Amino acid sequence: MIYKVFYQETKERSPRRENTQALYLDIDAASELEGRIKARKMVEEHTDYNVEFIELLSDKHLDYEKETGVFELTEF
C-alpha cells in the first residue's frame, strides 16, 4: 500500500499550511490503520519531521500523483 505523508520539516515551529511537504511510502500492512501506524513510526524514527497527516492512496489517486511528476517513493 502506498501512503502519502504530509509533514513539516521541523517540530520547533507551529505548522503552516504553506510549508507542508509530502513524501510517499510503500508500506506492507494488513489494514489501513496498521499502515498508518507503521508509516508514522518509520518517519519518526528516521527524521525530525512533524507528521501532520497520513493518507492511503487509492489507485486513481496514485495514478494522478504519478502523472503530476511529484511522485517518488521514499526509502529509509
UniProtKB/Swiss-Prot annotation:
Mind telling me what this protein is named? DNA-directed RNA polymerase subunit epsilon
Query: What is the reaction catalyzed?
Result: RNA(n) + a ribonucleoside 5'-triphosphate = RNA(n+1) + diphosphate
How is this protein organized at the quaternary level? RNAP is composed of a core of 2 alpha, a beta and a beta' subunit. The core is associated with a delta subunit, and at least one of epsilon or omega. When a sigma factor is associated with the core the holoenzyme is formed, which can initiate transcription.
According to the UniProt record, one GO cellular component term is: DNA-directed RNA polymerase complex
Instruction: List UniProt keywords, sorted A-Z.
Output: DNA-directed RNA polymerase, Nucleotidyltransferase, Transcription, Transferase
One Gene Ontology biological process: DNA-templated transcription
**Taxon lineage:** Bacteria, Bacillati, Bacillota, Bacilli, Lactobacillales
Record has Methyltransferase as a keyword: no
